[in-house]
């Protein structure tokens, strides 16, 4: 999941610090999520999707 969020940020020119500001999370939490070092909680995922203005199923594949 984190890799997909990172790929989205990279492809849209969005910095992790911007996402941290928009979600209220620390830079280190966003970094850990993007690197796959932290499992994302439901509330965190919701806030990330809301900040990026994407639907909740955006980062899910049919396989997930």
Regions found by a protein language model. Name each.
Residues 9, 20, 49:
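The alpha-helix within a helix-turn-helix
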Residues 1-15:
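A short, Lys/Arg-rich alpha-helix, primarily the initiator
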Residues 53-64:
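Short C-terminal boundary/hinge segments that cap the last helix of small helical domains
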Residues 14-32:
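Short alpha-helical DNA-recognition segment
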Residues 9, 34, 44, 63:
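DNA major-groove recognition helix of helix-turn-helix
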Residues 37-47:
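Short, basic-rich loop-to-helix N-cap that marks the start of a DNA-contacting helix
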